[in-house]
UniProtKB/Swiss-Prot annotation:
The gene is rplX. It comes from the Bacteria. SUPFAM superfamilies: Translation proteins SH3-like domain. Pfam families: KOW, ribosomal_L24. Belongs to the universal ribosomal protein uL24 family. Keywords: Ribonucleoprotein, Ribosomal protein, RNA-binding, rRNA-binding. HAMAP family: Ribosomal_uL24_B. This is Large ribosomal subunit protein uL24. One of its GO terms (molecular function) is rRNA binding. One of two assembly initiator proteins, it binds directly to the 5'-end of the 23S rRNA, where it nucleates assembly of the 50S subunit. One of the proteins that surrounds the polypeptide exit tunnel on the outside of the subunit.
Length: 113
């Protein structure tokens, strides 16, 4: 189970883009990969052809490629450094009814994510 979710701010902790931070655009849980904004950019060669909007030009296009989930860590909102993610159960009272909710938190600072 991936502890990284869409729209999380993550930092690359290993690989060619080590140290870069970006927002998670998409999570691929079956492949254990995440697509991070501005990280792991690759050049894609496009052939001239047609699509739904008409003809398209060929050429080179730079796009982000998915990166393995073990190579990124969630950034702590308080310290702005990579941290591990934990879960805890908190009791929330709403309209006189108490309810137990599972929340994610940064292990370094204890702040809720």
């Amino acid at each position: 189970m991936a502890k990284i979710k869409k729209d999380d701010l993550v930092q690359v902790i290993s690989g060619k883009d080590k140290g870069k931070q970006g927002k998670v655009l998409r999570v691929f849980p079956t492949d254990e990969r995440v697509l991070v904004e501005g990280v792991n950019r690759v050049t894609k060669h496009l052939r001239a052809g047609q699509d739904n909007n008409g003809s398209t030009e060929g050429g080179l296009q730079v796009v982000e490629a998915p990166i393995h989930i073990s190579n990124v860590a969630v950034v702590d909102p308080e310290t702005k450094k990579p941290t591990r993610v934990g879960y805890r159960f908190e009791t929330v009272e709403k309209d006189g009814v108490s309810k137990t909710v599972k929340v994610r938190f940064a292990k370094a600072s204890g702040k809720e994510l």
